[in-house]
Amino acid sequence: MTLTALGMPALRSRTNGIADPRVVPTTGPLVDTFGRVANDLRVSLTDRCNLRCSYCMPERGLRWLPGEQLLRPDELARLIHIAVTRLGVTSVRFTGGEPLLAHHLDEVVAATARLRPRPEISLTTNGVGLARRAGALAEAGLDRVNVSLDSIDRAHFAAITRRDRLAHVLAGLAAAKAAGLTPVKVNAVLDPTTGREDVVDLLRFCLERGYQLRVIEQMPLDAGHSWRRNIALSADDVLAALRPHFRLRPDPAPRGSAPAELWLVDAGPNTPRGRFGVIASVSHAFCSTCDRTRLTADGQIRSCLFSTEETDLRRLLRGGADDDAIEAAWRAAMWSKPAGHGINAPDFIQPDRPMSAIGG
């Protein structure tokens, strides 16, 4: 197992009496020293993207991962097979970058759908190319999609993404719903300047079309390291912007390990009722219930978006390691998962690897 430092200060994992940190489990679910079970696998297929969202990527000049470093379809299929059949993963989400740019997406989705037990299979996409791919992906075995959409105002969308592609995204949303990739969820990261206005229009748009809006607090994962807490909109800011326009009630259903805090929405007599979620990763962190394990496009396991270390499974794969060795390395990587992401710590330093190179 090879560990690659990311230039971040150590977030030292502490045990809470449930386990000996020196003894990594060799069977059972994928657990850490705090007793959390990771059964949700996020698989990044590429770091490339056809948008340039200001909170994620620079407008130009970002270096892509070399092609030879990216996992091949057979390598992805093998690692997902290990995760599902040996480590207890029940949900697989494909991410990027923009996963629709990965030529092997349909192939990997189909291979995942053939696994037994079959995991839930989902996709997070910017939606630009979804209109022409939704049907084929549904046939391959994809269950549902999350589409990133931060504004339905064309000028605001173009300013945030640095591309005038709103019409393509809206067409992708409609195609996903028509293909049965439901519930269709809309992920929004709000711009500090226009977000209070945008979120009202976004929620009404989603209610009218049967999509589920999820507003995500901006996290310090941009390539330009320009994130500032005092500028980014918080969950409380979002709710304050919505309350003058909608009647909101907390969803009484148990939240479990889901990242979104759900709200029931009444928009008045002319708009369907529904629900929306707020993912308050910064202001109300939910690290204690995190159930995710992450595989980057170049074959690294990350126990957390803000991990201080990565575990290199690609080297094991290409070095001839058997499934037992890969399973053991994966278990060890997750066993040392830190208690939390550390964003609120005074000595927090943003990771070198941006979100586009980790996978959402």
UniProtKB/Swiss-Prot annotation:
Record flagged with keyword NADP: no
Keyword check for Repeat: no
Biological classification of the source: Bacteria, Bacillati, Actinomycetota, Actinomycetes, Mycobacteriales
Residues where S-adenosyl-L-methionine binds: 55, 97, 148, 219
Domain Radical SAM core: 33-259
Amino acids binding [4Fe-4S] cluster 1: 49, 53, 56
Pathway in which the depicted protein is active: Cofactor biosynthesis; molybdopterin biosynthesis
Gene3D superfamilies: Aldolase class I
Annotated binding of [4Fe-4S] cluster 2, by residue: 287, 290, 304
Pfam families: Mob_synth_C (PF06463), Radical_SAM (PF04055)
GO BP of this protein: Mo-molybdopterin cofactor biosynthetic process
Domain of life: Bacteria
EC number annotated for this UniProt entry: 4.1.99.22
Organism: Mycobacterium tuberculosis (strain ATCC 25618 / H37Rv)
Binding site for GTP: 42, 93, 124, 185, 292-294
HAMAP family to which the protein is assigned, alphabetical: MoaA_B (MF_01225_B)
GO cellular-component term (any): peptidoglycan-based cell wall
Protein family (similarity comment): Belongs to the radical SAM superfamily. MoaA family.
Subunit organization: Monomer and homodimer.
Keywords: 4Fe-4S, GTP-binding, Iron, Iron-sulfur, Lyase, Metal-binding, Molybdenum cofactor biosynthesis, Nucleotide-binding, S-adenosyl-L-methionine
Molecular function GO terms recorded: 4 iron, 4 sulfur cluster binding; cyclic pyranopterin monophosphate synthase activity; GTP 3',8'-cyclase activity; GTP binding; metal ion binding; S-adenosyl-L-methionine binding
Reaction catalysed by this enzyme: GTP + AH2 + S-adenosyl-L-methionine = (8S)-3',8-cyclo-7,8-dihydroguanosine 5'-triphosphate + 5'-deoxyadenosine + L-methionine + A + H(+)
Function: Catalyzes the cyclization of GTP to (8S)-3',8-cyclo-7,8-dihydroguanosine 5'-triphosphate.
Identification of the protein by name: GTP 3',8-cyclase 2
